[in-house]
């Protein structure tokens, strides 16, 4: 009689505790993410567990329609989203949060924004267009092991989070020690993204933005941002990251995780 053998995930663990988080997008997912990310960073820094910097990039201002679904309040209207978020959480937790008051839409701007001497970049794309993902992917492919890429996205009730690391070192069968190895990016998991034709946020019309805003659900945004936070919390822990992809459904409450096992990663 054969027995099923449970495959244990091999933790992905960074070699440094000096990290720069660059969040692209301060809307539905990004504004909720920074709420918990700043708390996590504050706890780790107070305990002497690492040095962390946070930068948020977004070219939008807060509108009344953002107040319900996104992490903003009525008095925030008319102000730059990045300024609202940076001021709120830097004052709350005594952190210095960098701001970029524009959309990052080309590779040179991305490299300039992520690079801070001595700090390893983690780029978090909280965007609702594939053109930005394709731009980030070009930099990701051209600069192996330069940064970790966390992407999150969602439809009305479904969402996903994906952690990618471009490395020639693949996880080997039978390997068990935590370390850094290749994790598939959102583009590798969903290669059809490369065939899409959409616009950068700065190129969209008012009609485009209105349709997109109405397609979102507040529960989905909160859950997606929470899953990103959970994965970052794992990543910064002593044990490392054991999940590289999560799919969720805000209507049913279902969450499905892909673990960092040889079987899951061998084909990427």
Range-by-range predicted roles:
Residues 2-29, 33, 130-131, 135-268:
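Glycine-rich phosphate/adenylate-binding loop
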Residues 2-5, 12-15, 81-83, 89-90, ...:
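Localized chelating/binding microdomains
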Residues 11-12, 39-50, 114-117, 140-145:
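Alpha-helix termini
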Residues 17-47, 55-63:
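Glycine-rich adenosine-cofactor-binding loop
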Residues 50-95:
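Glycine-rich phosphate-binding loop and adjoining beta1-alpha1-beta2 segment
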Residues 77-120, 127-134:
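A structured beta-alpha segment of the ubiquitous adenosine-cofactor-binding alpha/beta core
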Residues 121-122, 147:
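Conserved acidic residues
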Residues 123-126, 151:
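Redox-cofactor binding/interface segments in oxidoreductases and associated redox assembly factors
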